[in-house]
């Protein structure tokens, strides 16, 4: 699936190493390969954006390597492809040898996979399903400040799905563990690939059922009910958390304005 890049090759360039992106001038490289010293490099076509190919190059650059978070404010489709590139680059880097027999592996030519020629084992990129849920109580939404994000941002609750657990069960468990409350009338909203490092966010809205807020101090600094027109600092646009909050605010405005 990969090929040697030629002088006149053009498109969007995802140059990635160890979960970092090359972002000259703070942007994804776009244009001719020759303009970015990529001629002769091996590249993998991982998609298309606005009629142009998106290429993945597994390479470290000495300068301007940054997080894919830096392009989160770009169009959702381009951010998604950048995330795909970073995740695939890390997958290929971390699966050079077979976990069963220890022999070297090689990329599949037909799908995103690594193959072992010795024991015939096949590996696919790991995807970790997560739930994220906006909880409404009359004209208010439950927002929390997470221990791992000490930047003042308040967001909705989220967590990983455990083995043998449905998405609905994961919502109920995570909400109870982190905030001590029960929810009802759960409704699926949307999903978002989230390459930090390889999550798939499944987004829900729910209504408060019962209980008082009792936070898990290992997960949260604080949590509280916030009226829809008096909210704290929120996650940035482009995140599924921000969409859930805005959808909840819109519902509250329709009822209480």
Curated annotation (Swiss-Prot):
Keywords assigned: Hydrolase, Magnesium, Manganese, Metal-binding, NAD, Zinc
GO molecular-function terms, A-Z: magnesium ion binding; manganese ion binding; NAD+ diphosphatase activity; NADH pyrophosphatase activity; RNA NAD-cap (NMN-forming) hydrolase activity; zinc ion binding
Cofactor: Mg(2+); Mn(2+); Zn(2+)
Binding-site residues for a divalent metal cation 2, renumbered to this chain: 174
SUPFAM superfamilies xrefs: Nudix
Gene Ontology CC: one annotated term: cytosol
Binding site for a divalent metal cation 3: 174, 178, 219
Residue ranges occupied by any Nudix hydrolase domain in the UniProt entry: 125-248
Annotated positions binding substrate: 69, 111, 124, 192-199, 241
Signal peptide residue numbers: none
Pfam families attached to this UniProt entry: NUDIX, Zn_ribbon_NUD
Function summary: mRNA decapping enzyme that specifically removes the nicotinamide adenine dinucleotide (NAD) cap from a subset of mRNAs by hydrolyzing the diphosphate linkage to produce nicotinamide mononucleotide (NMN) and 5' monophosphate mRNA. The NAD-cap is present at the 5'-end of some mRNAs and stabilizes RNA against 5'-processing. Has preference for mRNAs with a 5'-end purine. Catalyzes the hydrolysis of a broad range of dinucleotide pyrophosphates.
Family: Belongs to the Nudix hydrolase family. NudC subfamily.
Name of this chain's protein: NAD-capped RNA hydrolase NudC
Gene (name only): nudC
């Amino acid at each position: 699936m990969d090929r040697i890049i030629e002088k006149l090759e053009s498109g969007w360039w995802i140059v990635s190493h160890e979960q970092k992106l090359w972002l000259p001038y703070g942007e994804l490289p776009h244009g001719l390969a020759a303009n970015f010293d990529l001629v002769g490099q091996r590249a993998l076509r991982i998609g298309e954006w606005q009629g142009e190919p998106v290429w993945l190059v597994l390479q470290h650059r000495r300068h301007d390597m940054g997080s894919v978070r830096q392009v989160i404010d770009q169009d959702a489709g381009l951010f998604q492809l950048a995330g795909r590139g970073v995740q695939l680059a890390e997958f290929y880097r971390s699966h050079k040898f077979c976990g069963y027999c220890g022999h070297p592996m090689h990329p599949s030519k037909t799908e995103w996979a690594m193959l072992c020629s010795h024991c015939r084992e096949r590996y696919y990129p790991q995807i970790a399903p997560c739930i994220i849920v906006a909880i409404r109580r009359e004209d208010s939404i439950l927002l929390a400040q997470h221990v791992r994000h000490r930047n003042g941002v308040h967001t909705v609750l989220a967590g990983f799905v455990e083995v043998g657990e449905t998405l609905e069960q994961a919502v109920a468990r995570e909400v109870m563990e982190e905030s001590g409350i029960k929810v009802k009338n759960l409704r699926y909203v949307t999903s978002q690939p989230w390459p930090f490092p390889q999550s798939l966010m499944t987004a829900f809205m729910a209504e408060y059922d019962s209980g008082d807020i009792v936070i898990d101090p290992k997960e949260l600094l604080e949590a509280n009910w916030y009226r829809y027109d008096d909210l704290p600092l929120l996650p940035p646009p482009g995140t599924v958390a921000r969409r859930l909050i805005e959808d909840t605010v819109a519902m509250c405005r329709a009822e209480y304005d």
